[in-house]
Amino acid sequence: MLEIEKSCWSIAQDDEAGQKWCEENNYPGYTSYASLSDLIWRSPIFKDLKKILDLHVDQFSSELDFDLEGRDLKLEDVWINILAEGGNHSAHLHPNSIISGTMYISMPSETSAIKFEDPRHPMMMAAPSRLVDAKEYLKPFIYINPLVGEILLWESWLRHEVPTNMSSEERISISFNYSW
C-alpha cells in the first residue's frame, strides 16, 4: 500500500489542474476526478491495480447474474481522492456506469465510513421506521468502515456518500467506474 500511497501523493503534487479544480470548488484535499483521465498509463502501479480490479469486477458481475451478452465490462474512469480533515463527499451515484467501487489506501482512525442509502428511501414510501437492532440489510443506511487495501464494489445506481472526515489525517482512496 505504501507504494500506491506515494504514487497518489506524487500525482496530486504534479496535477495543477486538479489542484485548481479543488480550490475553485472548495474541495478540502485533492481529487483527480475532474483533471486526469490517464492514471492507468501514468504510473505502473495503476496498471497493476487495473488487473486486480478487472478480476474483482468480473467476479462481482458474475455474482450479480448480469447478462453481458458475451461482452466484458471495461474500466471507464479511475481517480484519486485525498480527503482532508473536515472534507466530505456528498451523496451521489455514478450515472452511465454499471459497477463502481473504491480501493482504500489510507484510513486513519476517526476517519469517516462510507455510507450507502437504501434505494427505496427517496421514493417517499409510507413505511414504518426500522427497529434499532434491525438486520443491517434492512436499515435505510449502511455504514462500512473499510480497511486499508480493501476494495468495495457496488452497482453504480446505489446512492452513497462519505460523511465529514473527523480525522486530522487524510483519508486516501482510489475510486473507479466500469461500463460497457
Language-model regions: role of each:
Residues 1-67, 88:
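Non-heme Fe(II)/2-oxoglutarate
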Residues 5, 115, 163:
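A short local structural element in Rossmann-fold oxidoreductases
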Residues 20-26, 38-50, 95-96, 115-125, ...:
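Short N-terminal helix-initiation segments at or just after the protein's N-terminus
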Residues 66-78:
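A short coil-to-beta-strand element that immediately follows conserved catalytic motifs
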Residues 70-72, 93-97, 166-170:
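A generic structural micro-feature
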Residues 76-78, 99-101, 172-176:
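Hydrophobic residues positioned within well-ordered beta-strands of beta-sheet architectures
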Residues 80-153:
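Catalytic core of non-heme Fe(II) oxygenases with the double-stranded beta-helix
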Residues 133-180:
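Catalytic core of Fe(II)/2-oxoglutarate
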